[in-house]
From Swiss-Prot:
The lineage of its organism: Bacteria, Bacillati, Bacillota, Bacilli, Bacillales. One of its GO terms (molecular function) is ATP binding. Keywords: ATP-binding, GTP-binding, Nucleotide-binding. It comes from Listeria monocytogenes serotype 4b (strain CLIP80459). Belongs to the RapZ-like family. This is Nucleotide-binding protein Lm4b_02443. Disulfide bonds: none annotated. Displays ATPase and GTPase activities. PANTHER family: RNASE ADAPTER PROTEIN RAPZ (PTHR30448:SF0).
Amino acid sequence: MASKQLKLVIITGMSGAGKTVAMQSLEDLGYFCVDNLPPSLLPKFWELMKESDKMDKIALVMDLRGREFFDSIEPALDELDNTNFITTKILFLEADDKVLVSRYKETRRHHPLEPNGSVLDGINAERELLSDLKGRSQLVINTSNMAPRELRERINNEFQTEDKDIFNVQLMSFGFKYGIPIDADLVFDVRFLPNPHYIDKMRPLTGLDEDVYEYVMKWPETQTFLDKLVDLLMFTLPFYKREGKTQLVIAIGCTGGQHRSVALTEFVGKAIQQKYETTISHRDMKRRKGR
């Protein structure tokens, strides 16, 4: 592991400029994230991380909440710059004074440098203290005119690896009698389709069995619905991805989650797999006794 090049992103900048959103975005990109690590511990922390065979991307939030430790950040960064197995990138987030004041008023929080005084005084003091760090940052983003979604999109564009599609579609079948999946982003009800449950030889089977699958698929309403559903998903998925989502859960439900929803989930999953990383699961299929 020691010979492997490790990536470190240090997230810093003005309080209220979006560091939490940036950290969450990097976490979604597979980074191991630590908030408010004292800079003096940075070299020791990295020595521990390099021994792990599971962590090669680390993101650390460092700001003036730990002001008593912040003076040590420059020596710590100098030490990292001299370490040949670490690639360090500093992400500095800032915003205009007027925007930062407005954000503090909305949240009714005190500025960490002026807990009992003027928010603007705290902003000015923080901007001065961070000026040197901003000067050595590789990426500076002004979030004054950015919504959180837009910042997530910018972070994704800057840091996602080219060889990995970070957008995953999870297709899940389920039975309405057992409840709608609480983590579903989109839910489709296919109980309007003819039900194989009422055919004796198909009742103990599932939508994974050929007889059931062919029965569900033979109906014109099934084919029309699937054409429209796949077309809808292929149209909307790029926009969900653009919003900064890294995962979209699509749930397809029938009465018991055994026949119709299973067959349609398999079909839709195979269609989506042609363009997106896709996971297919059947939440309630094993509830049937004997399976």
